[in-house]
């Protein structure tokens, strides 16, 4: 096994051939064995229109933990805030767009979901509930902003933010596994779901090195994985002997394995599952 050169290597439509994926759950359009729950749960009901992919539905059921308060101020908790933890120059922190022939860029849906498709038509994700017919703008916040416009709250500073006060556009959406458009529809959900990646072995060894007092060696292992996430492998914020600690390590685990069902295990291992 070896690390892929590109960040998307372990997740492509042909990731069954990836040298980094050590164990995966098979998904194949032709055989009808589709692993599509991430698409169904992360995406808005009308996200299929933005993707320009017909025939699939989604439940608007999940999004990333917010990084910002309703008034736009950042949360200051050391843990969590996943979208904010991605560096601005991280190639993954782009709006997801399918480019054709199995190629794509970005790993998230955020901002206004409106673009010109490969066929030249305008595609967009429009609202159904709080913002019916409007092009939705997905925000890194959770609050019922419509109630400020309607006069129920005088300002965003008064808005509560919890699991019951979201709107249909609340939260950043994760596209860890790629989604094609109608032109390449037979690729839909052909990505196997990675259960274990070789990058995880790097991170396990890095954590062991850190716990044994070898901070520099630990940092180097994290950086071997990190560098592919930046243009020309120039990492603007590498892990170093001086900035590595348990919080930086947990951030590295979170960012690299976001959406891969590791977070609870990692927090429990460090005794931080019930803290901020």
Go through each PLM region and give its residues.
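Acidic/polar loop patches that form or flank catalytic/metal-binding clefts of enzymes
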Residues: 2-6, 233-236, 259-260
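Membrane-interface anchoring segments and C-terminal beta-barrel signals
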Residues: 231-232, 255-256, 276
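Short, mixed-charge aromatic SLiMs
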Residues: 225-235
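Bilobed periplasmic-binding protein-like "clamshell/Venus-flytrap" ligand-binding domains
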Residues: 255-269
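Elongated scaffold/linker segments in the mid-to-C-terminal portions of large proteins
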Residues: 2-198, 275-276
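Short, mixed-charge amphipathic alpha-helical segments
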Residues: 235-245
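Extended, hydrophobic/aromatic-rich amphipathic alpha-helical segments that build helical scaffolds
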Residues: 1, 14-16, 23, 90, ...
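An acidic- and aromatic-residue-enriched active-site/binding cleft used to recognize and process polar
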Residues: 8, 28, 230, 254, ...
């Amino acid at each position: 096994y070896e690390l892929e050169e590109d960040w998307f290597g372990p997740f492509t439509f042909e990731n069954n051939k990836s040298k980094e994926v050590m164990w995966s759950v098979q998904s194949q359009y032709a055989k009808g064995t589709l692993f599509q729950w991430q698409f169904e749960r992360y995406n808005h009901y009308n996200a299929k229109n933005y993707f320009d992919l017909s025939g699939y539905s989604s439940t608007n059921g999940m999004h990333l933990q917010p990084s910002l308060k309703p008034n736009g101020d950042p949360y200051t908790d050391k843990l969590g805030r996943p979208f904010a933890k991605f560096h601005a120059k991280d190639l993954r922190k782009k709006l997801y767009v399918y480019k054709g022939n199995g190629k794509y860029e970005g790993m998230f849906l955020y901002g206004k979901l409106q673009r010109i498709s490969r066929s030249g038509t305008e595609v967009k994700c429009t609202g159904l509930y709080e913002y019916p017919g409007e092009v939705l703008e997905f925000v890194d916040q959770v609050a019922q902003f419509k109630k400020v416009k309607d006069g129920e709250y005088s300002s965003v500073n008064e808005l509560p933010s919890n699991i019951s006060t979201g709107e249909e556009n609340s939260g950043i959406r994760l596209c860890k596994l790629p989604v094609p458009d109608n032109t390449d529809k037979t690729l839909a959900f052909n990505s196997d779901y990675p259960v274990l990646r070789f990058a995880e072995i790097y991170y396990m060894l890095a954590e062991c090195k850190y716990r044994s007092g070898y901070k520099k060696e630990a940092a180097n292992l994290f950086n071997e994985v990190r560098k592919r996430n930046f243009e020309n492998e120039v990492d603007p914020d590498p892990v170093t002997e001086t900035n590595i600690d348990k919080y930086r390590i947990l951030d590295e685990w979170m960012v690299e394995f976001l959406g891969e069902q590791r977070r609870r295990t990692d927090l429990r291992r460090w005794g931080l599952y019930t803290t901020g």
